[in-house]
C-alpha cells in the first residue's frame, strides 16, 4: 500500500517513481482487467454505473437526523451578494435539483444562504452555508475510526479494491420531519433538501453508520469502512473476487450505487 503523502513526498523530491494498477480500457487508455472482474462489473451493472441516476433515493435503515439544541436555531443574516453570472448559475442548478427531486419548495422559517466556490476548471459549485446550523446541532456520538487501526487489519492481505462512495451522500435521505431544518433561501424562493448534503455536520458519520450496519457481517473480516470509502481486502485473488461479489450484492440490496470512475479495481496496492 502507498499513501498519498508518500507519493507527494517522492514527487517533491524528484525521485523516480513507478505505480502499477489494474484499470479498465476506455477512451484510448491501455489498461488491464481480468475476465472475472469484467464479468462482475457486467453482472452488477446496476450498481457500478458511469453516472448515478438523478432521482430521489429510497429511505434506508439509517437516515440523516438533524437534532437542534432546545430553544436554539441558526441566527438570521442577510443573503450573500451574487453577481449576475452566479445568480444565473444558481437558478440553473436549483432547476436541476428540483427536476431530480433532491429539493422541494419550502415555507420553513429558516434562512440558510447559498454561495459559490470556483472549481479548478473555472465552473461554479453551488454550496449551502450550514456553518450557523452546525453550531446549534446536537453532535452525533459516532467515532470516526483511526486510520492506523484500519491499516493493521490489512497487513496480511495482498489484494485490495476500493469503492469511493462520496457520491453516496446524495443517496441518503434526510430523516422525515428534519428536511425543513436545512432550508436554503434565495432572492426569490426557499427550498429544503430531501437528501443528505455535504456541508452538514457528521454527514460522514451517518454514512459510516449505514455502511457498518449494512456490512456488519463483513466488517473486520474482509472490508473496512472509513468515511465514504469501502476497502475490500483478501489474501488471494479467488477470495477477493468472492468478497467483491458479496459487497456488490449488498449494495444492490439497499439500492446504493457507485460511479465507475470512483472504483479502484482489484490491485495489490491502493490509495486512501
Where are these regions (language model features)?
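Retroelement reverse transcriptase polymerase core
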Residues: 2-272
Amino acid at each position: 500500500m502507498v499513501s498519498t503523502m508518500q507519493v507527494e513526498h517522492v514527487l517533491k523530491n524528484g525521485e523516480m517513481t513507478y505505480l502499477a494498477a489494474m484499470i479498465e480500457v476506455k477512451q484510448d487508455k491501455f489498461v488491464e482487467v481480468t475476465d472475472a472482474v469484467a464479468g462482475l462489473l457486467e453482472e452488477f451493472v446496476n450498481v457500478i454505473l458511469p453516472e448515478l441516476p438523478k432521482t430521489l433515493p429510497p429511505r434506508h435503515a439509517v437516515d440523516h437526523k438533524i437534532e437542534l439544541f432546545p430553544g436554539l436555531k441558526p441566527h438570521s443574516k442577510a443573503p450573500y451578494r451574487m453577481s449576475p453570472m452566479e445568480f444565473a448559475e444558481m437558478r440553473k442548478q436549483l432547476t436541476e435539483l428540483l427536476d431530480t427531486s433532491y429539493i422541494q419548495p419550502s415555507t420553513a422559517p429558516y434562512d440558510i444562504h447559498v454561495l459559490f466556490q470556483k472549481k479548478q476548471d473555472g465552473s461554479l459549485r453551488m454550496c449551502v452555508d450550514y456553518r450557523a446550523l452546525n453550531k446549534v446541532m446536537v453532535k452525533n456520538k459516532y467515532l470516526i475510526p483511526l486510520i492506523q487501526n484500519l491499516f493493521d487489519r490489512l497487513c496480511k492481505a495482498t489484494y485490495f479494491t476500493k469503492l469511493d462512495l462520496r457520491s453516496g451522500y446524495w443517496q441518503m435521505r434526510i430523516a422525515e420531519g428534519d428536511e425543513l431544518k436545512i432550508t436554503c433561501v434565495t432572492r426569490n424562493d426557499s427550498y429544503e433538501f430531501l437528501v443528505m448534503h455535504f456541508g452538514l455536520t457528521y454527514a460522514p458519520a451517518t454514512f459510516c453508520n449505514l455502511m457498518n450496519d449494512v456490512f456488519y457481517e463483513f466488517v473486520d473480516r474482509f472490508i473496512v469502512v472509513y468515511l465514504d470509502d469501502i476497502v475490500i481486502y483478501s489474501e488471494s485473488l479467488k477470495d477477493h473476487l468472492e468478497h467483491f461479489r458479496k459487497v456488490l450484492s449488498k449494495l444492490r440490496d439497499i439500492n446504493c450505487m457507485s460511479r465507475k470512475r470512483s472504483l479502484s479495481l482489484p490491485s495489490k496496492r491502493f490509495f486512501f
